[in-house]
Swiss-Prot record:
Subcellular localization(s) per the UniProt record: Cytoplasm; Membrane; Vacuole membrane
Keyword Cytoplasm: yes
Chief location bin: cytoplasm
InterPro entries according to UniProt: AH/BAR_dom_sf (IPR027267), PX_dom (IPR001683), PX_dom_sf (IPR036871)
Protein known as: Sorting nexin-4
Residue spans of biased composition, Basic and acidic residues class: 554-572
One GO biological process term: reticulophagy
Species for this entry: Komagataella pastoris (Yeast)
Family statement drawn from the similarity comment of this UniProt entry: Belongs to the sorting nexin family.
Cellular compartments per GO CC: early endosome; phagophore assembly site; vacuolar membrane
Amino acid sequence: MSDQFTSIQWDRTEPEGDVPGDSNDHSQVQINSSINLIEEDQGQEQEQDDLVTTNTVVRGGNDSDSNPNEQIPPRDVYIRSKVSQPLKESDGQNFYISYLIETETNEPGLAKTKLKVRRRFSDSNFLYNCLANDFPTSIIPPLPNKQRLEYIKGDRFGEYFTTKRSIALNNFLNRISKHPLLKQAKIYHIFLEDSVNWNTFKQNLKISSNPNSTVGGGSTTSANANGELDSFSDYIMNAFKKPTYESENAKEFQEITDKSNKLQENINKIDKIYQRVVKRQSEISEDFRLFGDEFKKLNQILTEGSDTQFDKELSQQFTSFSENIYQISYDSFKLTRQVDLHYLTSLKDLDHYISQIKNMIKFKDSKLLDYEMLQNYLNKAIAEKNHLMNGNNVSGSDGAMNFISKKIGSLRGKTPGQTYSSGNETNDRINKLNEKIEFLEREVKETFELFHTFEKNLITEYQLFDRIKNDEITTNLHELSQYYLDYYNSVVNHWNDVEIPHSEHLTDELHVLQQSQLRKNLENISIDPKLDVNSKLFEHDDVRLNNDHIRSDLRSIKSQERKNEQVHKQDQEQGEEQEHEQDQVQNQEQEQEPEELSREEAEVLETPVQAQEQEQQEPEELHASQTESHTQSEPQNDNQHNFDDDGSDEGLVDVEGLEQW
């Protein structure tokens, strides 16, 4: 920045030999208001009425396509381009890829209605830079990213990479053709036409690295370096600042930013999901191909050495089945490639297109910061002028210089009353400050008007972007659905051609075989088991090795089952033992409780029981002693016994009484 302020200019200097102009003056910023932004029949469509606003186009100098009275063409004017057929060519030293661009149009500015031309990627990049310089306030569709891994690993000439790039370039040209201002650019028409003007225009016109300014043919490397340094310094200064001025459209821009972030987030999610879908579909396609190969081998094995009509028909059915399997594999591969090349590439391009909007909003904020910075410089200049006029000090250095100048003036014989004489340094500085203030006021006014106009134009550009984005998303989804419809229709059509014999048809054939006695001949024919011996399809003992592997696998499976059964039995036995031990412990606890109770009761009842037993034992002993004495005295005392029987039974009564007692 020079002289403590910056100048906001979007200029474009024409190259030497094109259009004469004043090389000493900077080309001024021209804001061309196009009142009729949308086409003549736009009033019939309600959704397009919002776009009928003042659209400002910042163009450069005296360029031929910067006519202020230039009108937007009607809606029936169209330009349809298609990029295809990438071709590897050489310019004698290096190889490059050129793309065929086929255009159909009714644009009056073009010489033909159908155009064909081949352009390189660098030509498209040059077109993008020219449009960015001619229309700095418009949202220019982005080009595909050139910083790709293919440039490092050397696969930039491969079919996959070039096809994807041609689709991305096709999206780039279609977006330009849908923009009402960009499709009117002269450089765009020259790009589409097959003429020598393109190479001449490209050689004479030189575009600087700054996308907001064009440097003419007389520019030097030092000028470009200074411009890049200024841009880098401005970027560093504005990176950590935010504008304090809040415009009337601040809420609308905040809503635009939120919508853009949300849309970009959803697009990234869809892209990740379809990346996985494409990967799974490619694996399915490969599996179908391998399945078709194995089915074809099986058909050859079953039909080898068989010449009957039934075998021939069966072989035809097997062949038709395997061919349909191959067709499914091819259709799956085709579907995967279409989704990958067209749909995913369109999602990536739309993501980059949204990033362009966010960059334009950041560019608007940077211009607002420049306006605030110029306003601060103007306020400082006015404050410095007021201090000088009032005789006050602004800063230490300025006060010291003022004091020294006054002392020198006093030594020369100048009195303090002669402060504003013609030779006074303070007077000269005030005059310089007045010039600086006038220049800053003019710059501040122009910068604010430019910012205000840029803000309105950016709102209109977002509406145009929203319309282009909706059309593009609708077209992409329609194409995606068409890809899947074509895939399933192809599968159904191919499988309908396969004739599967019904049970009645098979019964009739068997009946014919029985009637012609072919069945007996077939029973006598010994057919070798094709899957047990080696043949052309199975060499190097593949069948035997396969059977060995199967037997070993069966053995391992059976051994594993036995081990599992043993482990299960051991677990059951351990569980039963644990339950038995628990039952024993519970029974022992229950037995110990009544034993303790019986011991206590026995101690309590021991005394009365012993007494009762003694009482019962005494009469028994007495009775036993009497019976013994009676038996001993019976032969000696017979008379006495008779006497007792006849006379009295006193002795017996006494015994009974004792017993009763």
